[in-house]
């Protein structure tokens, strides 16, 4: 006795195959949606982390930072911020792992923006200067040997970046910041 396969495959027409292809999202479209979702998630998480870490930092009027850089330059951040251009204040440390990613961006911004950095718990001026020379960084550095600047500012995370314009804090970022993110913060200050 012969058994026949009672389930015959239906003949597919060209119209059917076109319909099935249009119903299936393309891989590019699928990956695009995934990428947008990931960017949104990372953006929201980054914003939440900035908010969480900056809670102890001042809001509104900037806390004065007045001192002499390790390069011998007198610096008054509030006065610098009153010329209509924002000042990028960069709190960092020579031992900070995340600062390795942010410091090159800060150094490149030093050519076109006002930058003042504050080195936290990084040792004597000579050690900080050797670090700057080894990395070929040329942004101004105030060495916070006593820790009073970081205490006044409530800094508990390095790196931390504060944008100040006209004596007011316009933006605070903690952790790794992209060049585009920093540029946008200064642009909208």
What are these regions (language model features)?
Residues 1-68, 189:
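N-terminal targeting signals for export/organelle localization
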Residues 66-87:
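A short beta-strand-turn-helix
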Residues 68, 140-144:
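Short acidic-hydrophobic, aromatic-tinged amphipathic segments that line or gate anion-handling sites
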Residues 80-84, 103-113, 134-135, 181-189:
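Alpha-helix C-terminal capping segments
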Residues 84-87, 91-95, 157:
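Short pre-active-site segment immediately N-terminal to redox-active cysteine/selenocysteine motifs
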Residues 88-89, 115, 161:
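Hydrophobic beta-strand anchors of alpha/beta hydrolase catalytic cores
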Residues 100-135, 145-151:
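Structural microenvironment flanking redox-active thiols in thiol-disulfide oxidoreductases
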Residues 133-137, 145-189:
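Thiol/disulfide oxidoreductase modules built on the thioredoxin-like
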């Amino acid at each position: 006795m012969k058994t026949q396969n009672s389930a015959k495959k239906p003949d597919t027409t060209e119209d059917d195959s076109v319909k099935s292809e249009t119903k299936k999202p393309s891989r590019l479209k699928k990956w695009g949606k995934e990428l947008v979702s990931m960017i949104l998630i990372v953006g929201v998480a980054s914003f939440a982390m900035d908010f969480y870490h900056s809670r102890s930092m001042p809001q509104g009027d900037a806390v004065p930072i007045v001192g002499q850089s390790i390069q011998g330059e007198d610096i008054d951040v509030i006065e610098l911020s009153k010329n209509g251009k924002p000042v990028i204040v960069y709190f960092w440390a020579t031992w900070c792992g995340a600062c390795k990613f942010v410091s090159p961006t800060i150094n490149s911004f030093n050519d076109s923006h006002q930058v003042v950095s504050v080195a936290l718990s990084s040792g004597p001026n000579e050690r900080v200067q050797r670090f700057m020379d080894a990395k070929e960084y040329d942004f101004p550095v105030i060495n916070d040997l006593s820790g009073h600047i970081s205490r006044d500012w409530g800094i508990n995370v390095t790196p931390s970046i504060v944008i100040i314009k006209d004596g007011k804090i316009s933006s605070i970022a903690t952790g790794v910041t992209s060049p585009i993110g920093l540029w946008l913060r200064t642009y909208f200050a």
